[in-house]
């Protein structure tokens, strides 16, 4: 019996991620799925029955890659713009957790991301964000919330297959009933429960897992990896965890079926140069077996999520595949989704991304008076959490006020987002620390723009270790509540950067310092008009503005590999160990807020 075939691909070197081998063969596509997958060469009859025949001349064919822990918003673009950039790198399926938009807009924000992701050539599944807000209102001012009832409602959407990372791990193991109810709602809806465990070990980790949480993607060490695997977790390795020690530990495991590769967060400039393919390549370069690394980005994530028709080159699987000239050689030469060629040589083959722009969404930023804050608001001790009785000294006639204060200082570093806290004697001159290594920082809640809200007075915090010696940075993209984060050395420059962001209706800005008698220099600006988080411009356009801001930050002294990412994580109130909120300094482990001035 002759079978009609939409496409026949021959002379392929097929990567078998199940048996960890390769073989020469051919396969056919029918109605978007793989029909025959065979070794050797097809018969003349098979070729003649195909509507189209592609001869790969021995090129490699691997399954399309699945990134099953990621946040589209980290690339600062809408889903359609993200798909246009990620598809040419071979990422054919993603599981997005839109917890950035969710933290600003709640359940309607998740639904907006669902709608904006439909009709794309990339397969987009969604996790309902579990920690909105990420922590309690006593720690920081939230902008939105998601209830267990909303989880149940959103889970009815066919693309919703998971409950996003449970970030408030301390709250959960301490018995927070709301968090437990969120997990119960997810479990009852049949969703995969995702974890976020940067520091739990021993009995605390066991209690966390016992709620039904199945995975972790945070920074790994060999010991952490082994404990989580022993306790039944699926371990997701993102780029910062691809170290020689971790890879060596993974390669020493007799069973690696629960070890996956993910991206988590990819900034727009990095997205231009690669997506999950870059993580796979780095893993291989660090000593990971090539086909095993591919399995960690294809069949294993598909198995984890129960997406059994994805992640393999086998009969009945969706015809999502990637063509490379050599094993795991990227970028791919061709990318297919459902048997349709969607990308070739690093670019989309057709205008396959839907043309209509996504519906506009607001996020309170546009409600601010752009000039609501001035230099006086950004002096240390100007408002709540100020210097009080902890100061000494007095201004000399005609000189700037000079004071001494016992302050709590957040100590950051260039390598990661972990921070410590120290108490120091700090000298202030007109509200600015004399020590050039210290910067001022504050978070302004979006809620301050709500009609009828009382005027907000910023609480200033001191941070050491950023390397920022000049200029100021402001952003409406600040994990996880995405209130407005501002940092710099000079209060007037901080006000300039903030004004630029507010005038734009959201975004990121870097403002250079300038002498008081001179006009301000050119402000570098990246506009994010959709909820203060996203742009619908092409990734290349957004990346260019992003690069300008990163270059400005580096020129201003920052040495971090990803300076913008580091700054956006400083307000993340569930990330160890001390962070900045609109209330003051967050002691993450102690689940409390400390004043910037030591008692």
Regions found by a protein language model. Name each.
Residues 62-69, 96-99, 127, 164-166, ...:
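Active-site neighborhood of phospho(di)ester-bond hydrolases with catalytic His/Asp-centered motifs
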Residues 39-42, 98-101, 129-130, 168, ...:
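Short, ordered loop/turn segments at secondary-structure junctions
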Residues 6-7, 63-65, 93, 161, ...:
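Hydrophobic "anchor" residues on beta-strands that sit immediately upstream
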Residues 80-192, 517-520:
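Divalent-metal coordination cores built from histidine and acidic residues
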Residues 1-25, 29-30, 87-89, 271-287, ...:
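Active-site microenvironment of metallo-dependent hydrolases
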Residues 12, 32, 58, 69, ...:
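Divalent metal-coordination and catalytic microenvironments
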Residues 145-165, 171-237, 241-261, 271-292, ...:
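Histidine/acidic residue-rich metal-binding segments in metalloenzymes
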């Amino acid at each position: 019996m002759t079978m009609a075939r939409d496409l026949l691909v021959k002379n392929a070197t097929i990567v078998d991620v199940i048996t960890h081998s390769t073989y020469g063969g051919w396969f056919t596509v029918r109605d978007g799925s793989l029909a025959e997958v065979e070794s050797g060469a097809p018969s003349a009859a098979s070729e003649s029955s195909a509507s189209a025949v592609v001869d790969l001349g021995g090129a490699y064919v691997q399954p399309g890659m699945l990134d099953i822990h990621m946040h589209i918003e980290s690339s600062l673009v809408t889903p359609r713009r993200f798909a246009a950039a990620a598809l040419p790198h071979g990422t054919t399926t993603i599981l997005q957790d839109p917890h950035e938009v969710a933290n600003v807009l709640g359940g309607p924000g998740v639904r907006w991301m669902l709608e904006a992701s439909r009709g794309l050539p990339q397969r987009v599944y969604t996790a309902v964000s579990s920690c909105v807000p990420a922590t309690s209102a006593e720690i920081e001012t939230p902008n939105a919330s998601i209830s267990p009832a909303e989880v149940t409602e959103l889970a009815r959407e066919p693309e919703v297959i998971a409950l996003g990372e449970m970030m408030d791990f301390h709250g959960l193991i301490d018995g927070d009933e709301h968090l437990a109810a969120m997990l119960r709602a997810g479990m009852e809806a049949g969703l995969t429960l995702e974890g976020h465990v940067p520091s739990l070990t021993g009995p605390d980790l066991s209690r966390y897992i016992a709620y039904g949480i199945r995975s972790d993607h945070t920074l790994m060490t060999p010991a952490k990896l082994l404990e989580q695997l022993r306790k039944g977790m699926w371990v997701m390795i993102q780029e910062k965890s691809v170290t020689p020690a971790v890879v060596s530990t993974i390669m020493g495991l007799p069973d690696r079926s629960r070890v996956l590769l993910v991206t988590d967060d990819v900034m727009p400039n990095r997205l231009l140069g690669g997506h999950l393919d870059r993580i796979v390549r780095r893993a291989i370069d660090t000593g990971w077996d090539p086909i095993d690394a591919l399995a960690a980005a294809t069949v294993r994530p598909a198995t984890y999520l129960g997406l059994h028709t994805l992640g393999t080159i086998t009969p009945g699987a969706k015809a999502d595949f990637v063509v490379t000239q050599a094993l795991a050689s990227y970028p791919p030469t061709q990318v297919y989704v459902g048997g349709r060629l969607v990308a070739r040589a690093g670019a989309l083959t057709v205008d396959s991304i839907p043309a209509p722009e996504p519906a506009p969404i607001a996020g309170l930023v546009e409600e601010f008076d752009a000039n609501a804050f001035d230099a006086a608001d950004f002096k240390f001790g100007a408002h709540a959490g100020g210097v009080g009785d902890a100061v000494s000294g007095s201004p000399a006639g005609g000189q700037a006020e000079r004071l001494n204060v016992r302050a709590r200082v957040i100590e950051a570093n260039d390598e990661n987002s972990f921070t410590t806290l120290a108490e120091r004697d700090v000298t202030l001159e007109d509200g600015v620390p004399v020590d050039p290594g210290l910067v001022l920082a504050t978070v302004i809640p979006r809620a301050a723009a709500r009609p009828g809200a009382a005027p907000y007075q910023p609480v200033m915090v001191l941070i050491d270790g950023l390397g920022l010696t000049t200029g100021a940075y402001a952003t409406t993209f600040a994990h996880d509540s995405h209130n407005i984060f501002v940092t710099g050395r000079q209060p007037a420059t901080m006000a300039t950067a903030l004004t630029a962001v507010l005038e734009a209706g959201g975004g990121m800005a870097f403002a250079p310092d300038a002498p008081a008698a001179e006009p301000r220099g050119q402000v570098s600006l990246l506009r994010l008009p959709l909820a203060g988080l996203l742009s619908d411009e092409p990734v290349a356009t957004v990346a260019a503005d992003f690069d300008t801001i990163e270059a400005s930050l580096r020129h201003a002294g920052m040495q971090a590999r990803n300076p913008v990412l580091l700054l956006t994580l400083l307000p993340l109130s569930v990330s160890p160990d001390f962070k900045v909120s609109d209330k003051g300094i967050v002691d993450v482990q102690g689940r409390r807020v400390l004043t910037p001035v030591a008692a």
